[in-house]
Amino acid sequence: MTLQFEAFCAGGLAPGWSLTVQGHADAGEEKFEINFLTDAGDIAFHVKPRFSSATVVGNAFQGGRWGQEEVSSIFPLTLGEPFEMEVSADAEHFHIYAQEQKVLQFPHRHRPLATITRVRVLSEHRLAQVELAKRSLSWGDGGY
């Protein structure tokens, strides 16, 4: 797979960060993954759509070993069609959406989140756009 995108998360990951990837899933090109990395070399979160099995897999690589995979059979992606995937983080989970449909919720296995400092997207697909954004989270009525 080819490194298509890499970004440094200033101050580390925090609730409110999101990554959106848009591209085209060409037939015969089934490989695509997103990795959230720590400075220590761990993969705090790895998400990979598997077109051959129509599943989305989440996992973490810590201390030199992979953890237990979490697999979702909710798979709205189609080879030969454009796609959009979004990964967002709150205080407890990563949330993965494909084609605006929630496909997986993955609990944070790596703490603190601030030690997650890089994001990599590897793909054989043509990526049209990758956006890493930090949105502020608010709660309540805003004083109105």
From Swiss-Prot:
Q: Which InterPro entries is this protein grouped with?
A: ConA-like_dom_sf, Galectin-like, Galectin_CRD
Q: Which residues carry this modification: Phosphoserine?
A: S138
Q: Please give the Gene Ontology molecular function terms for this protein.
A: carbohydrate binding
State the Gene3D superfamilies in the record.
2.60.120.200
Q: Which domain of life is it from?
A: Eukaryota
Tell me the ranges covered by the Galectin domain, including all copies: 5-133
List cystine links.
none
Give the comment on domains. Answer: The galectin domain is atypical and does not bind beta-galactoside sugars.
| Assembly information from the UniProt record | Homodimer.
Q: What protein name applies here?
A: Grifin
